């Protein structure tokens, strides 16, 4: 299909620098960030796994994972109709229809949509902000992506636990200041935090992201991995980040 038929007015086609894959995005709506890239590389996806991406946005995580993992199939769940449409067109553009299936729906309904204990891995880059005060328009795409408007942290963790097979992993990126709540909620829903990695914008700055792996019905033992530093200086990525694009 010609590019003009896939990419619409106001949209752009971005090179993911992996296996020739591209993604369709609309800068006025919402574009993926570094958190999605880091989460894709943090997730340890085993060969022939069935994977669910909860809150896929425009589908960047399953597309990246098609390039860097041997998973057999990805289901991707997204509530926003426009994002579902863009994600579906990106999947088609990359010829990945046999590996990625996009479904419109709410994260809090994931187990009703897909069934219980059916996935080998769940990956999620959920809304980070639980304070809805000051939102001028809670229906704006960027607000929905960033704020817990249609699902809460507990919804995300509960549904991940419900759809995961025993001893299988949830991979999540979130904000460090919510770690106590994240860990407590995970353990309430039979998810044991097993691996954690903090992400710092600069070596002298506090972390602004945290990558977490939790295992359903896992044994208590948390491994804290070396931190990721994103920038050496303003506008210059560290070698850690540059290596992700090799």
Where are these regions (language model features)?
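Conserved SAM/SAH cofactor-binding pocket of Class I
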Residues: 42-135, 158
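SAM/dcSAM-binding transferase cores
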Residues: 206-246
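Mobile active-site "lid"/loop adjacent to the S-adenosyl-L-methionine
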Residues: 126-155
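General small-molecule cofactor/ligand-binding pocket signal
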Residues: 24, 101-103, 194-197
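Class I SAM-dependent transferase core
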Residues: 3-46
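Short glycine/threonine-rich catalytic loop with a Thr-x-Gly-x-Asp
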Residues: 30-32, 58, 204
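Conserved Class I SAM-dependent methyltransferase catalytic core
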Residues: 150-201, 205-207
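Short, structurally constrained coil/turn elements
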Residues: 17, 45, 96, 187-190
């Amino acid at each position: 299909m010609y590019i003009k038929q896939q990419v619409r007015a106001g949209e752009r086609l971005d090179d993911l620098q992996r296996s020739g894959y591209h993604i369709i995005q609309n800068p006025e709506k919402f574009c993926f960030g570094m958190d999605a890239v880091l989460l894709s590389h943090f997730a340890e996806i085993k060969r022939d796994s069935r994977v669910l991406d909860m809150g896929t946005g425009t589908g960047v995580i399953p597309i990246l994972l098609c390039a860097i993992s041997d998973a057999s199939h990805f289901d991707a769940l997204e509530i926003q109709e426009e994002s579902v449409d863009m994600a579906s067109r990106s999947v088609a553009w990359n010829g990945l229809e046999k590996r990625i299936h996009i479904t419109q729906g709410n994260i809090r309904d994931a187990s009703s949509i897909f069934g219980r204990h059916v996935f080998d891995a769940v990956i999620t880059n959920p809304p980070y902000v639980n304070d809805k005060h000051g939102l001028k328009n809670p229906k704006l795409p960027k607000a929905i992506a960033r704020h817990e408007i249609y699902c809460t942290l507990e919804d995300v963790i509960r549904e991940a636990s419900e759809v995961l097979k025993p001893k299988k992993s949830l991979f999540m990126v979130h904000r460090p200041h919510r770690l106590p709540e994240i860990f407590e909620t995970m353990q309430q829903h039979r998810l044991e935090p097993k691996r954690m990695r903090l992400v710092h914008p600069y070596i002298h700055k506090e972390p602004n992201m945290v990558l977490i792996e939790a295992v359903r019905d896992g044994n208590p033992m948390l491994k804290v991995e070396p931190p990721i530093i994103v920038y050496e200086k303003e506008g210059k990525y560290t070698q850690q980040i540059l290596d992700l694009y090799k």
